[in-house]
Design a protein with these regions (language model features):
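Membrane-water interface segments that mark the loop-to-transmembrane alpha-helix transition
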Residues: 5-17, 43, 48, 52-103, ...
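Interhelical loop/hinge segments that connect adjacent transmembrane helices in multipass membrane
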Residues: 1-3, 179, 191-235, 278, ...
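Signature of the first transmembrane helix
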Residues: 2-60, 91, 95-99, 156-160, ...
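Membrane-interface junctions at transmembrane-helix termini in multi-pass inner-membrane proteins
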Residues: 127-151, 338-368
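Helix-loop junctions and terminal segments of transmembrane helices
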Residues: 26, 55-71, 141, 200, ...
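Transmembrane helix-bundle signature of multi-pass secondary active exporters and lipid flippases
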Residues: 17, 40, 44-54, 227, ...
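Interfacial segments at transmembrane-helix termini and the short loops linking adjacent helices
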Residues: 102-122, 248-251, 312-341, 387
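Hydrophobic alpha-helical transmembrane segments
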Residues: 116, 120, 150-198, 368-372, ...
Length: 415
């Protein structure tokens, strides 16, 4: 399945997801404001980190090896059974840690209500989403794209309905509960559709633990854990610095800008997730180079058109998607959009490192991005105010893209 065909399949899911996110984001913005967006950003970061650690960060490894060995039941059994046990073990460990340190986590999340019951539900949701992620990684690897799309669409719609309902009834408390309950609902949707479509033999999950595949998958865990951890820590620092330097209106507006980015980048991200790693894993150097340039020919015009449209319609987008409270975004949107153009092309190169299990390089580039972004944000915010955070974002991606190209120069640029 080529990149364009995969894009068309995922486009259906993405279009529905975008529409649903537009509606839910609007309601959240109107009823919760910039402060609510700020608090939800904190929880989303924590959930993202929880989901990575609870699965030991091996999802990309599962995609790679199921793609390579999907026709060899013996090897596939070793991969899937090992992956299943890893997910169960680490999600249970992480849940115990959540319950033990719930008060500290509550302070980080700025949750000021009785949190014991909340963190019990949060623990269950972490286990649920860990299993969901495992199953989705498997069907990603074996390229069951129609089922993948169906699960995403149904989950997004149900999750949005729950989020909107709880926000309207319970405001910020409802939103905080909706985020974690939705992870449980997502697993239930996945299991129901797996029961109907039966994409693979579930007995493959319940075989012996294979130490050799655990070692191979562990290499991917370092990459998967490093990426979100660096992103979450760096955005956490910058978000809090904006809140401290100015107030939560600025921090919430910056978080809202990231949400707008997430919506218009969703189409390309969903295609990348399903297509790049399985495809790159199978290609030799010459064919991989051709594939990268073929993808760039499609991606670059698309992202330029999208970001140009977003910029020209920025006032309408802010009003429709959010509210007048978020017009601070106008100060940062231009350079943020330019940064996104470079960012999407960095992701193509980053997936080469993942598909080839180049752990050291991947970890270096994740740390490099985070360190540069935090340092530049500090100095440029002090020098130029709120606008400085978008300048830091843009410059960071220029440096990041340049370094990635230099690292991959033999593959991409030297004949």
């Amino acid at each position: 399945m080529n990149f364009i065909r995969t894009s068309l399949y995922s486009g259906v899911s993405t279009a529905i997801s975008i529409l649903v996110r537009l509606i839910s984001n609007k309601i959240i913005a109107v009823y919760l404001g910039t402060n609510g967006i700020f608090l939800l950003g904190q929880l989303k970061d924590f959930l993202r980190l929880s989901n990575v650690f609870s699965g030991f960060g091996i999802e990309n490894g599962i995609i790679k090896y199921t793609s390579e060995f999907q026709k060899s039941e013996g090897e596939l059994r070793k991969i899937l059974s090992t992956s299943f046990k890893v997910h169960i073990f680490f999600s249970l460990i992480f849940c115990i840690l959540i319950l033990i340190f719930r008060n500290t986590i509550a302070e980080y999340l700025l949750v000021d209500f009785d949190s014991t019951f909340y963190f019990l539900i949060l623990s269950i949701s972490v286990i649920s989403f860990s299993i969901h992620t495992l199953l989705m990684s498997i069907i990603n690897g074996i390229k069951k794209i129609k089922l993948y799309v169906t699960i995403n669409v149904v989950s997004v719609v149900i999750s949005a309905i729950l989020m909107i309902t709880l926000v309207l009834k319970y405001a910020i408390i409802g939103a905080l509960y909706a985020l974690i309950i939705n992870q449980i609902i997502t697993l239930l949707v996945t299991l129901f559709l797996f029961y109907i479509y039966k994409p693979f033999n579930f007995n493959l999950l319940f075989s012996n633990f294979n130490i050799n595949y655990f070692k191979k998958l562990s290499g991917f865990s370092i990459m998967a854990i490093t990426g979100p951890t660096c992103l979450i820590i760096s955005t956490f620092i910058v978000r809090y610095y904006l809140s401290d330097k100015f107030d939560t209106n600025f921090a919430g507006s910056w978080e809202a800008m990231w949400r707008i980015s997430a919506i218009y980048l969703l189409f390309l991200i969903s295609t990348f997730k399903f297509y790049l790693i399985p495809t790159f894993s199978k290609l030799n150097s010459e064919n991989l180079k051709k594939e990268v340039f073929k993808i760039w020919k499609v991606v670059i015009p698309i992202i330029i058109v999208i970001t140009t449209g977003v910029y020209l319609l920025r006032d309408i987008i802010i009003t429709v998607l959010l509210s007048n409270e978020f017009f601070l975004i106008n100060e940062i949107i231009f350079l943020h959009l330019l940064g996104d153009i470079i960012k999407i092309n960095c992701w193509v190169l980053g997936n080469i490192l993942i598909s080839k299990a180049d752990t050291k390089a991947f970890v270096f580039f994740q740390i490099e991005w985070s360190v540069i972004f935090v340092i530049l944000s500090y100095f440029l915010i002090n020098a130029y105010g709120f606008w400085g955070v978008s300048l830091a974002y843009f410059i960071t991606y220029v440096i990041h893209f340049s370094l990635l190209n230099f690292h991959l120069r033999k593959l991409l640029w030297i004949k």
